[in-house]
Design a protein with these regions (language model features):
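Aromatic-patch recognition
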Residues: 58-60, 69-197
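Sec-dependent signal peptide cleavage junction
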Residues: 18-58
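Bacterial Sec-dependent N-terminal signal peptides
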Residues: 1-26, 232, 244-245
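Intrinsic-disorder/low-complexity, polar/charged segments
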Residues: 28-30, 195, 221-225
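Exposed alpha-helical structural elements
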Residues: 35, 117, 198, 209-210
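Surface-exposed, beta-sheet-biased, low-hydrophobicity segments with strongly acidic/polar composition
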Residues: 50-52, 67, 71
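Long, compositionally biased interface segments
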Residues: 201-245
Length: 245
């Protein structure tokens, strides 16, 4: 009478736990449950290193915003995990937990949370994110940063989402608030970019050319800080390469 409940407990503890072992008690499992276990074991065998982490539980219904960088849709990209590059991986970047979520299988069978310190970088579409470890000489908070440009200087953006409870017509609801911070890294030194003055100081070697370029592109710091920082640092790196040729 209590056997189905017992089977569910066994499955849950083996499948959505820390995912460190195979489930192999086939005597207790049959039908669709056995298919799920077989699928999980096969996938763990094929992708043992990457697909290794706790189960990712979905968030409550959120009225405003999304906890993920690119919304709820799964993105297909690549991730460098323990110095091995994995391509065509289904992923989401959770900005609330600052964690990369990967999906086993195309049909959404099992979302897992990867151990962040083992990830060097991940990317999808034209977006790239790098992991800054605690041991880094940079005075930056440990975690993932979007790489806006890369070269002699590197522009980074740190996006943090917070899940907040709100009361709407006597009902409890949730919303996302977002905070972005920008940095430029030069020679293992990080500089916080809050104002256009900070940006111009970071690119002072080519200041006038960059100012002219931003004017031509009609880019204004106050209206689109991220685009201006990306454009300015990309041009700076291009001019640096040209001067060294």
């Amino acid at each position: 009478m209590h056997q189905p409940f017992f089977i569910c407990i066994i499955l849950l503890s083996s499948v959505i736990g820390n995912c460190q072992f195979y489930y192999d008690d086939s005597a207790l499992v049959s039908g669709s449950s056995k298919y799920l276990v077989n699928f999980y074991n096969k996938t763990r065998h094929d992708f043992n290193v990457l697909y290794n982490g706790p189960f990712h539980y979905s968030y409550p219904l959120i009225k405003q915003g999304s906890p993920y960088f690119s919304g709820e849709a799964w993105q297909k990209g690549s991730v460098t995990y323990e110095d091995i590059v994995y391509d065509t991986v289904l992923m989401k970047y959770d900005l609330v937990k600052d964690q990369l979520i990967v999906m086993i299988g195309e049909k959404g069978h099992m979302p897992l949370e990867l151990f962040s310190p083992r990830i060097k970088e991940f990317s999808y579409k034209d977006l790239k994110f790098i992991y800054i470890p605690r041991s880094s000489p940079l005075s930056l908070k440990e975690g993932f940063y979007q790489q806006l440009s890369n070269g002699k200087i590197t522009a980074l953006c740190k996006t943090e989402n917070t899940l907040e409870e709100i009361i709407v017509e006597d009902r409890l609801e949730w919303k996302i608030t977002q905070k972005k911070r920008y940095f430029i890294v030069d020679n293992n030194h990080s500089r916080t970019i809050n104002r256009q003055k900070d940006l111009m100081e970071a690119v002072k070697d080519h200041r006038q050319q960059i100012i002219n370029h931003l004017k031509e592109q009609k880019l204004k710091f106050k209206k689109n800080k991220e685009q201006v920082i990306a454009a300015a640092t990309a041009l700076y790196n291009k001019l640096e390469r040209q001067s060294n040729e």
